[in-house]
């Protein structure tokens, strides 16, 4: 919320501001806007690929970028899913997502067609007695690419942890820290970052 950023800068000008992934920063105009507003670290949207991250890092060399590298991928645009608010009255855009896309559902029979293609099923779900997480996207794991991100100028890596145990967070943080240290020592094992 630009208003919150403005108030924070007005009342606490010495506090560094970090922008959440929920701001969905996906392009140079957004980065320029938030930078001009006084944001020091911008967490880029999870949906960006290496080419987009590289372009932003090259266009804005003084910006401290953070990239989400490990955890759940959102069914919608990151942080903008309404399913959690609808199912559990816990809005994702307030950091309270219950990840209902990961719940197991049973679609007894569902055919979806688009108005202009009547009679042509675009999406079909048919299941028996079992339940499944058919809405859940595959988790994000960019461990192999942390060196590439570091070389692009990404200054911080974001790991999912809000809904995880302390032990899980410690283990994942250690794995990524080790990968970054190996990259800093230029040990072999990383992919071609193209």
Residue ranges and their predicted role:
Residues 38-39:
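As written
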